[in-house]
Amino acid sequence: MKKDISIAPVPGRKWTIGIRYGSRIEQLRILPVKAVRITNEKHDSVMLSNPDCAPWCRTRLKMLVTSECTAGYALQPGSLVLKDAGGRMFEPGKDYEINEEYGTFMRTADGRIREGEPVFASYSFFHSRLDSIVLAEDGVIVQRLGDEDMATPAPPPVQPGEKLLANIYFSGHPDRISGDMIFPVLTNRLPVSPSQTELMPETVAKLKSGKKVRILVWGDSVTECSYLPEKEHYQTMFLKRLRSAYPKADIEMRTLGWGGRSTTTFLNEPPGSPYNFMEQVVAWEPDLVVSEFVNDGGYSPEMCEECYGTILDAFRGNGIEWLILTPHYIKLSWMGLTSQKNCSEDPRYLVRFLRKFGKENRIAVADGSLKYGHLWENGIPFMSYMVNTINHPDRRGMKLFADALIEAMTEN
């Protein structure tokens, strides 16, 4: 890991960073993301206040819309103004409720916004952006601007002769640069999952011999992945690489994903349900089940033991091998994190449990979490991979899963 670079905010200067690179010490003024002002954006109607409605599912400011949700913290606080067609201003807290984190709002039951009445919204917001600090070919350290995006900004390409030193992540509405926005590039590698072919002997033997192999990929919305093209699903990438690694392989792969659900949900589904565990997972008679459940992340130790123990008993009793994919990193507050840096150790009990459970029971574990936890060392904030700014990875995040799976399934 590189130790010859240090970048930090300069005290007393809102948008200036101090750079130590080798024997060089200098300062660089950073160009921040500018607010965008929207005037009189028409909304044909406003949802009635409902405390059970998720904050990102309410009436959405249109410029903040991402995949399925709205961009968290993109709205400039205090900037929203709602008016009727005649220009009369509505009062927040009285006529409507606003969630400034997600840029959504609802009309109150006793307010002046009527059912079906159009309203006109004016507000300011910020795009996300991932810039690069590079050592240019002429020896000058410069800021390269990335493309602005509401959810998944990508860093600019590094030109021939340039050296990438760090990335700067603009997200939300910062009023000055902070250390948490600066991602020095400490390495260009991610941890590799060890080969675990010995824990899936029957499946691997069939892959090598050309006998028919049935693989069931089982999970939640990340596995269902209705928000991305099929070619960008992790299991599609995994299948392509599996066939390349085992040229004789005859693979039948099926996906069973259910958005917003967990292992417990599947286990509790009644007979006849298209998501009943015994009928739709076990009875399909797969040789191998690949499981991914980020939605199990809030499970207690007792729930982990009960659910995963039940699944293991069913698989072992029916000759099914298992490859557990540890979950990706998600919205910081949902993980108990305060920064996307120095987060190599996943704080979720579920991940620690799955690693231990795999070792104790000789179950293969592909460690997707481990790769996400080290993105910061590569200069990448993991939230820049989330298309909904919460928990749905883009194609780059899906590739990390495919990497972890193929590493576990091959002799690396």
Describe each region flagged by the PLM:
Residues 255-272, 299, 342-343, 390:
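Acidic/histidine-rich helix-loop elements
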Residues 268-285, 305-310:
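Short, well-structured alpha-helical segments in soluble
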Residues 192-199, 329-412:
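Catalytic His-Asp segment of secreted/periplasmic serine-dependent ester chemistry enzymes
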Residues 1-109, 115, 126-129, 134, ...:
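Extended beta-strand solenoid/passenger and fiber regions
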Residues 191-257, 276-285:
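Serine-esterase "nucleophile elbow" of acetyl-processing enzymes
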Residues 156, 168-210:
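Non-catalytic propeptide/linker segments at domain boundaries
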Residues 261, 275-278, 291-305, 324, ...:
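Serine-dependent acyl-ester chemistry module
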Residues 316-322, 363:
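A short helix->loop->beta-strand "cap" motif at the edges of active sites that frequently abuts
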